[in-house]
Design a protein with these regions (language model features):
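Outer-membrane beta-barrel strand-turn architecture
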Residues: 19, 29-33, 45, 83-89, ...
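Outer-membrane beta-barrel translocator domains and adjoining extracellular loop/strand segments
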Residues: 1-8, 49-57, 102, 106-115, ...
């Protein structure tokens, strides 16, 4: 049972193994010791990707299971930077940045009621940055880390029935909305002894899960959302 989404989860004995083909083109530059700049273009093809999907249930609670899609294609660009900050007078400090932009599209089996969407669990962008302090002479280490991911599908919706027969039922995709996360850590060595302190998710922002559904109101198309 998933308490965050208030839904039951069941297995699927008919699942097929997923296969991934990956191609990437990467440029890397190392300006000095401990520094790196890299840019990568990548493409991934998924065959039979496994997704967490809403399935029909006779009960009142939603039920999710793991289902194979026909395929999926992901492509994008990734940038990775590691830089010492001595050049601006911040000795023993360094900075890192990792960011990615990803375009994702799922391929569906013929005859289904699905519409174009990204692969479940895939965010359109990822951002990770960090500020680090390292002083080996005095035994100090510290870091501030920031993370953010774009809106992503965590539960694939489904469509059942036929509009012409009056039994159509639409279960929208469930999305995890973007949130900011900051982690702090510091450590100090005393000979062979090390003391370390860590604070995770300093901002403690709420997790929001939303469903969006297109409806017609007074002859105009609108999108309504439900928040959990």
């Amino acid at each position: 049972y998933d308490f965050d989404l208030g839904s039951s989860v069941m297995g699927n004995s008919s699942l097929q193994a997923a296969y991934i083909q990956n191609v990437d083109l990467r440029y890397e530059w190392y300006p000095s010791n401990g520094e790196q700049v890299s840019i990568a273009l990548f493409y991934k093809h998924f065959e039979n990707p496994i997704e967490w999907t809403y399935t029909m249930s006779g009960g009142t609670d939603p039920v999710y299971s793991y289902v194979n899609a026909k395929g999926a294609n992901n492509y994008g660009i990734e940038v990775d930077i590691r830089k010492n900050l001595d050049f601006i007078g911040m000795r023993n400090f360094s900075f890192s940045f990792n960011g990615a932009w990803i375009k994702s599209k799922v391929q569906f089996k013929e005859g289904g009621n699905n519409i174009d969407r990204p692969m479940q669990g895939q965010s359109p962008y990822l951002i990770n940055t960090g500020l680090f302090y390292n002083n080996p002479d005095k035994g100090w280490n510290a870091a501030v880390l920031y993370n953010r991911i774009g809106k992503r599908i965590i539960g694939v919706g489904n469509r059942y029935g036929s509009s012409s027969e009056g039994d159509a039922r639409n279960i929208p995709n469930s999305y995890e909305m973007p949130r900011n996360s900051i982690d702090l850590s510091a450590s100090k060595k005393f000979g062979k002894l090390e003391i370390k302190a860590t604070v995770r998710d300093l901002l403690a922002e709420r997790y929001y899960f939303k469903q969006f559904e297109d409806v017609i109101v007074n002859g105009q198309a609108r999108t309504i959302e439900e928040v959990t």
